Curated annotation (Swiss-Prot):
InterPro entries registered for this protein in UniProt: YspA
HAMAP family registered for this protein in UniProt: UPF0398
Lineage top rank: taxon: Bacteria
Family: Belongs to the UPF0398 family.
One Pfam family, short name: YpsA
Organism: Lactobacillus delbrueckii subsp. bulgaricus (strain ATCC BAA-365 / Lb-18)
Protein name: UPF0398 protein LBUL_0921
Classification via NCBIfam families: PRK13660.1 (NF010181)
Length: 186
């Protein structure tokens, strides 16, 4: 069983506005290309992601789309049980819809938010329950995913059977060109 942890920038870190922002389309296209390649090679069974607004929710949406054509499962993991409870009603509804459509969802901490320890435990869980990670993240442009990136880099020193794939800004520029080229062909 091959499992991938997907994370990356939050929507506000990328300056995305609304669900129809062209940047979201390009990011989802890049994620879809990565996942499709793994699926075609028989190297992916589960997408395991968080529920942060941004790359995590977009990757869950891509996994749900790919599930129509591939034997792919989606798990949405939360760092604590009431994650997202302070979001707007619309964003809470998006989270609930993702949880409803996922093959599995749970929280690594069964209580309400108590502190940073829950995020570290969440990271540890994600790393221990996946075989590779895909981060839409560029170390030259730090964001909240810096903590995931640094933790994975640290653990890679001890575990050589884990793989980290980065989709950085250069990769996103290439994905935008590829996406635009594919749209012209239609």
């Amino acid at each position: 069983m091959q499992r991938i942890w997907i994370s990356g920038y939050r929507g506000y870190e990328l300056g995305t506005f609304g669900d129809k922002d062209p940047k979201i389309t390009v990011i989802k296209y890049a994620i879809k290309q990565c996942l499709t390649n793994l699926l075609e090679e028989g190297q992916l069974d589960w997408v395991i992601t968080g529920a942060n607004l941004g790359v995590e929710q977009w990757s869950a949406e891509v996994a749900l789309e790919l599930r129509q054509d591939y034997n792919l499962r989606l798990a949405v993991m939360l760092p604590y049980l009431d994650f997202g409870s302070r979001w707007s009603e619309n964003n809470q509804l998006k989270l609930q819809n993702l949880k409803n459509q996922a093959d599995f969802w749970s929280a690594t901490s069964k209580g309400p938010y108590q502190g940073g320890r829950q995020f570290r435990e969440y990271q540890q869980f994600m790393f221990q329950h996946t075989d590779r990670a895909l981060l839409v993240y560029d170390p030259e442009y730090p964001g909240k995913s810096k903590y995931d990136y640094e933790m994975i880099e640290k653990y890679l020193e001890k575990r050589d059977d884990y793989q980290l794939d980065l989709v950085d800004y250069y990769d996103l520029e290439q994905a935008a060109r590829d996406y635009e080229g594919n749209q012209r062909e239609w």
